[in-house]
Design a protein with these regions (language model features):
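Conserved structural motif at the start of ABC-family nucleotide-binding domains
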Residues: 6-8, 21-23
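The feature captures the beta-strand-to-loop junction immediately N-terminal to the Walker
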Residues: 37-39
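ABC ATPase NBD Q-loop/coupling interface
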Residues: 63-79, 143
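Q-loop/switch helix immediately C-terminal to the Walker
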Residues: 90, 96-110, 123
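ABC ATPase C-loop
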Residues: 159-160
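Helical segment within the ABC ATPase nucleotide-binding domain
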Residues: 181-194
């Protein structure tokens, strides 16, 4: 394995006083793609939420190390600033906030500085073109009226724009047709090529994996 980016040690996680994860151990190196597989109900998504710091998922013991730092107690926004990204299985609709405004705000939070609007929009248009997304989606309210495939493309677009160190994709290929899976796979490959970031792909299917190079697979 290359230099460790993510290291999870003996992680126990509870949701509403019910323990979901019972001592999980996992390590992901820099510039690696790992797959987390298993049937529904085994805690795959719970692990993703725990890594990103969702407060509904309580770590009762164990640790999460990211880039050599213990982030177990860090709030979700601080983990995002450090370069952890989660693509949701069912992305929420956000009326009143356009896709473009959401991504720009997230980038400014990450960098701590204002972005030049023209430069941002140019990069956004170029990235959308790579994913075969119509430019009009940038000015639509985030995920409002989007099809399942469009929501997943919007998540991949955010990943490419934010360039995290670690991207966690939770069932990104779930419910998609062949063309949408192909586009998502292309986005994942572009992420690896452009950023050399690491990926943790959570899935119970093998469709998206057929087009990707995977360094390691884990079963829950």
């Amino acid at each position: 394995m290359k230099k460790e980016l993510l290291k999870i040690q003996d992680l126990h996680v509870c949701v509403e006083d019910k323990e979901i994860l019972h001592g999980v151990n996992l390590a992901v190196g820099q510039d690696e793609t790992h797959v987390l597989m298993g049937p529904n109900g085994t805690g795959k998504s719970t692990l993703g939420y725990a890594i990103t710091g969702n407060p509904a998922y309580s770590v009762t013991s164990g640790s999460i190390l990211f880039d050599g730092e213990d982030i177990t107690a860090l709030p979700v926004n601080e983990r995002a600033k450090k370069g952890i990204f989660l693509s949701f299985q069912n992305p929420l609709e956000v009326p009143g906030v356009t896709l473009s405004a959401f991504i720009r705000s997230a980038l400014e939070q990450k960098t701590g500085s204002r972005l030049r609007l023209w430069d941002f929009k140019k990069r956004l248009r170029e990235t959308m073109a790579l994913l075969d997304m119509d430019e009009s989606y940038a000015e639509r309210d985030l995920n409002v009226g989007f099809s399942g495939g469009e929501k997943k493309k919007a998540e991949i677009l955010q990943m490419l724009m934010l360039e995290p160190k670690l991207a966690i994709l939770d069932e990104t290929d779930s419910g998609l047709d062949v063309d949408a899976v192909r586009t998502v796979s292309k986005g994942v490959r572009l992420f690896r090529e452009r950023t050399h970031g690491s990926l943790l792909i959570i899935t119970h299917s093998t469709r998206i994996l057929e087009a990707l190079h995977v360094d390691a697979a884990h079963v829950m």
